[in-house]
Amino acid sequence: MDRIFARFFCFLLIAAVSHAADLSPEQYWRSILPNTPMPSSISQLLNYPYLPAVRLPRRTDAGQRNYKSSVSHVAERSHRVDDGQRNYKLSALPATNELPHRTDAGQRNYKSSVSPVAELPHRVDDGQRNYKLSALPATNELPHRTDAGQRNYKSSVSPMAELSHRVDDGQRNYKLSALPATNELPHHTDAGQRNYKSSVSPVAELPHRVDDGQRNYKLSALPATNELPHRTDAGQRNYKSSVSPVAELPHRVDDGQRNYKLSALPATNELPHRIDAGQRNYKSSVSPMAELPHRADDGQRNYKLSVSPAAELPHRVDDGQRNYKLSVLPATELVHYTDGQRNYKSSVLETPELLKDPDMALFFLEKNLQQGKKINNALHFANLLATTNSKFLPRGKADSIPFSSKELPEILDRFGVRPGSDDAAEMSATLQDCELPANKGEKKACATSLESIVDFVTSSFGASDVDAASTVVLSKAVESSSLAQDYTVSGVRRMAGTGQLIACHPESYPYAVFMCHLTEATTRAYKASLVGKDGTAVEAVAVCHTDTSDWNPEHAAFHVLGVKPGTVPVCHFMQPDAVVWTRRG
């Protein structure tokens, strides 16, 4: 009878395992943990990626994220609208060399093309100034000038040549083209500020004119120059150009802030460099290795674009906090996950950079976890995994992929990661961390699937009646809530269960991998309601370690909090992408 019962039990076990293998990760959760709601840190990772096109952000500090992703060689590159006023659209299609169109406050537009008949950029500043420069070789027409809508200077030195047209009083139009039939250009000095100099014939000197000691026109006839007008307005604007085959078109400095340089060299397609208030710079070229515009806005935003096959798409720094890096390489991108709490035995003597990690702000003293207390740590709660393609793989798929340091070359090849790269180093570090033995009094495992996490939790607790909790940002008052800020505790409650708990932290890897560890019995878990300085509401999970006597005296937490091992409980908040498990009851 016992033998029959044993065989029947084995049959049921095999049937259960076979049935579980047919379940999706979400279904597996519900079958094993029917009374445990799934936290957002887990549910956000249930959409499976198509390997190997997976990527994760590199997190270097709280609120300062670096995102890398890959795009195909024919992909359309980043579209950006800033304050509804600036639009950048750059296409990497090999059939076109069109450079970016830009509208600033609905007033400035840059459009350029490097085809032989292309127009160089049109610019409208404050809806009043228009610059149009044509590279057509069929004309040398130079500007006519009207100042205050009252003065018109027009001269001609050949049947074909016209000089410049100009409208002043904030309504200036420059049109320059380049017939080789004339070299005549005006010299003009207005209040000692404007100067035009050009040449018209081998022998002739044209009249000098002084009007109120302010305007001087001198036209000389040196045959060796094709220099176009130099103009200085209030010591601030300078135009210099040449119509020779290697000539440069005008340079312009407006209030010491804007510079335009356009070259008519047949061998170059370089478009204008622009500096606005010392802050914006555009440089572009569509040669095979050329860079597209660099832009710095208020010293905070930078765009760098290249159309070469290995080029980088724009880097953007917004308020010094977020950095986006997009690569056209198909290689997998990873998250650089820095968690100041993962290794409780870490030493700042061995890794002094830990003290600079913004996650150190997550440490606090348990006595401050009271209603009305202010956490003056400039906290930032960042859910990195929510914006990436790093998802859980079904256990069958995850188990089929090697996961050990010895097999790193095969793993890198599988995910298209170049050996020796930063991503390869991150993956290697994750594998080594997972292979380290657990700390004293702990049990740990690296789970490569959601099913593996569930199995680790239930086997460690010996029960399936558990709670899972993650930090959740409930509301953001304003966009600036992404900044690190002080929070005030509006409520605290102890999480159900006593004794040991399990904490799971995400690791740097192409797909979702969590390091889970069962902590000592001397830990307590809390849920704290926090309100930020700007009104942001956060339901934060906090873990307190009541016995730190065996911690490394050089642990970063002791330096941050100014305490010694074994004296007071050391607590830390959990980031939204981590999970804390407790036994219910």
From Swiss-Prot:
Location of the BURP domain: 363-584
InterPro entries found in the cross-reference section: BURP (IPR044816), BURP_dom (IPR004873)
Membrane-spanning parts: none
Tissue: Expressed in leaves.
Chain residue ranges for the region called Disordered: 63-82
Keyword Signal annotated: yes
Keywords: Signal
Superkingdom in the source lineage: Eukaryota
Signal peptide (residue range): 1-20
Entries under PROSITE patterns matching the protein: BURP (PS51277)
Name this protein carries in UniProt: BURP domain-containing protein 17
